[in-house]
Amino acid sequence: MNLRKNVIRSVLRGARPLFASRRLGIAGRRVLLATLTAGARAPKGTRFQRVSIAGVPVQRVQPPHAATSGTLIYLHGGAYALGSARGYRGLAAQLAAAAGMTALVPDYTRAPHAHYPVALEEMAAVYTRLLDDGLDPKTTVIAGDSAGGGLTLALAMALRDRGIQAPAALGLICPWADLAVDIEATRPALRDPLILPSMCTEWAPRYVGSSDPRLPGISPVYGDMSGLPPIVMQTAGDDPICVDADKIETACAASKTSIEHRRFAGMWHDFHLQVSLLPEARDAIADLGARLRGHLHQSQGQPRGVVK
């Protein structure tokens, strides 16, 4: 294990008591997460514009020299309660640059001010409005990390069930997709330096509210995976949430839905946020971007390059 990776792991472990402490409050932990996400710096020359789509604030992210080959709709993480579009726009910019796309990062309403299904319905409204305004779904991908990864999968299921044109592909980074195990406090502990199962147990009820946590809109691992766009998924071996990805992969195999799953051994939840510091994170973002871009070519009927 290299020195830089060791240092980052130690920093995250040092921050864990603050994230786990309810005494800090939601506002305090939002500030703490914003400090960590700031480590994902956008490529130099990236342009940002704040817009509104279907009444939802959105960060429009244009990486430098990015080809206008497609649109990345990026749903940020943060346990449905802590993250923000501004805080995650650096990560979205890195992925957009790797994929050669422009990114849109919606600021969905967070828990506990809004429970399920508010965020899901807002994202469905944003996507539908974009289609109405001329967005081509064949050159569009939806991606997200952690809670945003679960929301990405739930959104794709909702679009399918409503007969709305699907995007070309989905990108899932360490998806939090089974909140039922957290309501029941049965998530296993692994070696993640930051994430503890007890944190998931705290945050899941804030989003679930009085709903059934096994609803596919909340925990898409319990939903029907058939008829979904191709999925590109990346996970971390030390992340206790990685078991959700295993359930997704198993369900996709059963329904014959295309899925590419790459697990990074010895890495932690959302290590992609250290893209400006860690070679492993840069490799992950470059690989995810290339694979998502490849699905655009495939959906347009163009020859698809081999992605290794």
UniProtKB/Swiss-Prot annotation:
Pfam families tied to this protein: Abhydrolase_3
Keyword Signal: yes
Disulfide bridges in this chain: none
Active site: S146, D239, H269
InterPro entries from the UniProt entry: AB_hydrolase_3, AB_hydrolase_fold, GDXG_lipolytic_enzyme
Signal recorded as keyword: yes
Protein name, entry field: Putative acetyl-hydrolase LipR
Keywords for the protein's UniProt record, in alphabetical order: Hydrolase, Signal
Motif Involved in the stabilization of the negatively charged intermediate by the formation of the oxyanion hole, residue numbers: 76-78
Family indicated by similarity: Belongs to the 'GDXG' lipolytic enzyme family.
UniProt GO molecular function: triacylglycerol lipase activity
Enzyme Commission code: 3.1.1.-
Record function comment: Required for maintaining the appropriate mycolic acid composition and permeability of the envelope on its exposure to acidic pH.
Biological process according to GO: biological process involved in interaction with host; response to acidic pH
A cellular-component GO term for this protein: plasma membrane
Factors inducing expression: Expression is controlled by VirS. Induced at acidic pH and in macrophages.
Organism of origin: Mycobacterium tuberculosis (strain ATCC 25618 / H37Rv)
Domain of life: Bacteria
Annotated signal sequence range: 1-40
Phenotypic effect of disruption: Inactivation of the mymA operon causes altered cell wall structure, reduced contents and altered composition of mycolic acids along with the accumulation of saturated C24 and C26 fatty acids, and enhanced susceptibility to antibiotics, detergents and acidic pH. Also impairs ability to survive in macrophages.
